[in-house]
């Protein structure tokens, strides 16, 4: 994992979230609504995440890119909710909770966001939070990511 320096969130995401908050409709399905009904905003979100992360998956650092910009050597970016929507619906459109990750599957083996699923990674800090120190992350030969002891 690398430290991710978050920049300003895309305008479309901010406006959509503020609209949901003001009319009381913010829920875990708000993200899907944003993705499905606001393609321009969703593309802006993907591009912003890709730029901040230098085109790398937030977990394994594999090269990623938004679907429309993907080259043959890159994985398609998936928007990852670091804190899962199932438990933290109020964070589903919070930019600091959104990261870019790879599709997370090699054959039948799941990794990264696909392996994480709806679990909370309490022991692994959000790489976009202040004070994140990449040196505390250890990578095992089997691909496991854990805290350096």
Annotate each predicted stretch with a short phrase:
Residues 59-60:
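Short, cysteine/histidine-rich loop/knuckle motifs that typically chelate Zn2+
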């Amino acid at each position: 994992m690398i430290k991710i320096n978050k920049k300003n969130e895309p305008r479309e995401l901010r406006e959509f979230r503020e609209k949901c908050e003001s009319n009381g409709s913010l829920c875990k399905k708000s993200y899907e609504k944003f993705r499905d009904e606001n393609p321009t905003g969703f593309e802006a979100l993907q591009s912003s995440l890709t730029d901040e992360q230098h085109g790398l998956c937030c977990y394994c650092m594999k090269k990623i890119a938004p679907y429309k910009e993907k080259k043959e050597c890159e994985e398609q970016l998936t928007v990852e909710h670091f804190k899962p929507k199932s438990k933290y619906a109020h964070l589903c459109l919070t930019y600091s909770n959104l990261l870019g990750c790879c599709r997370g599957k090699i054959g039948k083996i799941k990794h990264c966001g696909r392996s994480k699923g709806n679990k909370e990674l309490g022991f692994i800090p959000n790489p976009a939070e202040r004070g994140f120190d990449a040196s505390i992350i250890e990578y095992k030969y089997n691909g496991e990511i854990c805290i350096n002891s």
